[in-house]
Regions:
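Core beta-strand elements of the Rossmann-like FAD/NAD(P) dinucleotide-binding domain
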Residues: 164-178, 182
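Classical protein tyrosine phosphatase
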Residues: 33, 46-52, 91, 95, ...
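Mid-to-C-terminal "cap/lid" subdomains and adjacent gly/pro-rich loops that border
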Residues: 79, 146, 185, 195-320, ...
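Short FAD-binding loop at a beta-strand-to-alpha-helix junction that anchors the flavin cofactor
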Residues: 18, 444-462
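N-terminal glycine-rich phosphate/pyrophosphate-binding loop and immediately adjacent elements
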Residues: 1-55, 201, 209-211, 219-228
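FAD-binding beta-loop-beta segment adjacent to the flavin cofactor pocket
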Residues: 328-340, 427-452
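Glycine-rich phosphate/pyrophosphate-binding beta-alpha loops
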Residues: 23-24, 457-469
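Conserved redox-cofactor binding core of oxidoreductases
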Residues: 38-155, 224-242
Length: 507
């Protein structure tokens, strides 16, 4: 949220990273996203090349979806359909045909359309990467700052600190940085890899002058489209958390507590400037069967960085009522931000500048998808049947505009924006000769031996969807690359079983 407020940028601190706290959703993105990567210089990262790695990790438990030729079974990562469905979700599904879209598996043959969610859920509970993928190293409760150690332009190990003790570990092969889009560039810059002038400003000796921390991207959206539905069942906190639902969740892995953080459906649609024949939608809508009014301001208010004044003016009048939310967002924003060091103290958070709406077109598109959300509620029989109505309260700072007019929606979009916690791109992958890249197509840091980056920071551009599944794909592909580049390695503790039958899967 803006109006001089800071946006929350949560990260997962623990084994499994942000898969410990994400919204569960399993979305691969669009085929054309990866073909664009290849076109931009990321050789070997086209859809045809990455698709097998999605299949390799996947264990899809929904037979209606798992057997359609676009999914894997037998992998480590459990993917299942959300088993809980409210009357709001049924209205959302029925509205799809009224808007001219199909209701489909958005990870299947085509992406454009409305869909029920699939997510990394096993027996109703979160299935993080730490839970999914086996490993032999003992679990450690301590978490530490670490950074690569260098001898000239070669990574030779890692230096890290637990409590007051500094440790050094030397590598026989490579150092692999997987700190994520925020921490990986911070670690590299602290180690002397980054923009020359920025490192000089902080007195850090230069090892490699690379655009580390540039190219920051995230999906941009807003939480400000909320509705009341008198004839529907929403997820009210007072009705959600009770002994019966708790028992059903704990013992059966069923019930409303298994919902994906309240989000039930999503739609991938086209803006007026997008070519629908490409099946490369540029706008997205999440449908959540609740709103910040549903929990009396206990959880969601803080999660989106909402002020007390906004809550009192917009949401308090709807407390205790059946409300729901559309989260519209722009899938491929053109604005680019940066990650920079605040200081040389590794325990101090870096400076994050998402630079939202640097390109005005991003604001135009967000306003357009907000208008589509309003139209869905006001002009579809599916939502009229459940008595869906727009909130009649106005957001502070936009009161001078007519409610839900173009000017009002644009004002709200600009001032109540939030990022969807899908940051990528700060260690961009691509052609080594390209001055905008940090790592090559095999994820090796340019100009530095024995150093790779393996996480979402290497994405050249955002994918058209949530980033959890694509980052897992990157890790699967990277593991093969590392083995190929180190043929003299000792055998790994995890047996590498190829679970891909080449002729089985449709492309």
């Amino acid at each position: 949220m803006c109006f001089f407020q800071q946006l929350p940028w949560p990260r997962g601190k623990g084994l499994g990273g942000s898969s410990l706290l994400n919204f569960f959703m399993y979305v691969r993105g669009n085929k054309r996203d990866y073909d664009l990567w290849e076109k931009l210089g990321a050789t070997g990262w086209s859809w045809k090349k990455v698709f097998p790695y999605f299949l390799k990790s996947e264990d899809n438990t929904d037979p209606q979806i798992a057997n359609n030729g676009y999914h894997g079974t037998g992998g480590y990562l459990t993917v299942s359909s959300c088993q809980y469905s409210s009357t709001l979700m049924r209205a959302f599904q029925n509205a799809s045909s009224e808007r001219g879209y199909e209701y489909r598996d958005i990870n299947g043959e085509k992406q454009t359309g409305f869909s029920k969610l699939q997510g990394t859920i096993r027996e109703g509970k979160r299935c993080s990467t730490a839970k999914s993928f086996p490993y032999t190293s003992s679990r450690k409760k301590e978490f530490a700052h670490c950074k690569p150690s260098f001898c000239s332009e070669e990574a030779i190990g890692v230096e890290f600190q637990i409590e007051d003790t500094i440790h050094k570990v030397y590598t026989r092969k490579e150092v692999i940085v997987s700190g994520g889009t925020i921490n990986s560039p911070q670690l590299l810059m602290l180690s002397g890899i980054g923009p020359k002038n920025h490192l000089k400003k902080h007195g850090i000796p230069l090892i490699a002058d690379l655009p580390v921390g540039d190219n920051l991207q995230d999906h941009v959206g807003t939480h400000s489209l909320n509705f009341e539905a008198k004839n529907a069942t929403a997820l009210l906190m007072s009705k959600l958390v009770n002994p019966l639902n708790m028992w059903d969740f704990r013992n059966n892995g069923k019930g409303p507590l298994t919902s994906f953080s309240g989000i039930e459906g999503m739609a991938y649609i086209n803006s007026k400037r997008n070519n629908p024949k490409l099946d490369w939608p540029d706008l997205e809508i999440h449908m959540a069967s609740g709103s910040p009014a549903s929990d009396h301001g206990q959880i969601l208010k803080a999660a989106v960085g909402m002020t007390d004044n906004v809550y009192r003016q917009v949401y308090a009048p709807y407390r205790g009522k059946n409300t729901f939310t559309f989260f519209p967002c722009v899938l491929r924003p053109k604005s680019r931000g940066t990650i920079r060091l605040k200081s040389t103290n590794p325990f101090e958070h870096p400076l994050i500048d998402p630079n939202l709406f640097e390109v005005e077109e991003d604001l135009d598109l967000l306003t357009e998808v907000m208008k589509e959300c309003v139209d869905i509620i006001q002009n579809t029989e599916a939502f009229k049947k459940i008595g869906a109505k727009m909130f009649e309260t106005k957001f502070p700072g936009c009161e001078s505009h007519e409610l839900y007019s173009d000017a009002y929606l644009r004002c709200v979009a600009r001032n109540y924006v939030f990022n969807l916690y899908h940051p990528v791109g700060t260690c961009r992958m691509g052609n080594p000769k390209d001055k905008t890249t940090v790592v090559d197509s095999r994820l090796r840091v340019k100009g530095v031996k024995n150093l790779r980056v393996v996480d979402g920071s290497v994405m050249p551009t955002l994918v058209s969807g949530n980033t959890n599944a694509p980052i897992i794909m990157i890790a699967e592909k990277a593991s093969d690359m590392i083995k190929e580049d180190n043929p003299d390695r000792k055998s790994c503790s995890r047996e590498d079983k190829n679970r891909i039958e080449k002729n089985r899967w449709k492309k």
